[in-house]
Amino acid sequence: METKQTDLVIVGAGTAGMTAAIYAQRAGKQAVMLEALSYGGQIINAPDIENYPGMAHVSGFDFATALYEQAKELGAEFRFERALSIEEREGSKAVLTGKCTYLCSAVILATGAKNRPLGLEKEQQFIGAGISYCATCDGAFYRGKTVAVNGGGNTALEDAEYLAGLCEKVYLIHRRDAFRGDERDVEKLRQKPNVEFVLNATVTELLGENRISGIVVKDKNTQETREIQIDGLFIAIGQMPDNTAFSKWVTLDENGYICAGEDCCTGTAGIYTAGDCRTKTVRQLTTAAADGAVAARAACAEQS
């Protein structure tokens, strides 16, 4: 197995991770970024970003690509490998993947979060057969059809708006009577004749044999249930972190997020965290970028 020496290893290439790489390279440190999937994280699927200062309208893909190219131009190295564990070796941190061992002085964990499932029977079976977690990835398959979006945050609202431009009918299902996302986006959806809000309701059952054909939703107030016939279900009920591989080195809260304050310090020398994977009240592109800058500066200062 290959062994590589570097100053800093950043686990995760989302907004936080790539911002950390930019700041590290500008500080004269060599950063290696490890990403199991694609750069950009969850934002790469957003059709339009309106809440990042200085960028009134930009797609998630273009935003992520700009960060990626900026970090690369500054000399950051990207490797598409999954970080499996961290070890201590003769005063250095060793980050192990299936292909290489990276020796470094500091590690920034910017692993982000993954889509949260409903946890219903047949959910895994129907992935790719009517169930999706990415409207911009799979929405075109449902052009002219009837779909449902389950969720109440900005992602769900963005998904519903995007799908409303493709689909004959969009049901937007939320367990509360008010959405958590931006009110401006809610008002946009209210004006669309092919979008129907199903509030105070939860999806309790997935219908279909080889692919989804409908859902059962339960009204939280009346306890009554109804069947809704759909061709596709887009699940956008939030995210959950995946930090268990690093639990030896950092403290995780009850939900699996890395415990750290605004200084992005984990309490373990040489290990920092940034972005959606850490404990915080606001998870936005701006806060992820801020975390990346803070974590990188702290990691670089420790090496000075």
Regions picked out by a protein language model, each given a short descriptive name:
Residues 2-5, 140-146:
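Short helix-loop-beta connector
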Residues 4, 71-96, 101-102, 164-261, ...:
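A Rossmann-like FAD-binding core segment of flavoenzymes
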Residues 6-74, 157-182, 253:
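Beta1-alpha1 glycine-rich phosphate/pyrophosphate-binding loop at the start
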Residues 13, 111-112, 237-238:
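Glycine-rich, N-terminal phosphate-binding loop of Rossmann-like dinucleotide-binding domains
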Residues 14-15, 38, 113-115, 153-155, ...:
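Residue-level detector of alpha-helix initiation sites
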Residues 78-143, 152:
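Glycine/small-residue-rich loop that forms an oxyanion/phosphate-binding "nest" at active or ligand-binding sites
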Residues 119, 125-141, 237-286, 291-294, ...:
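FAD-site-proximal beta/loop scaffold in flavoenzymes
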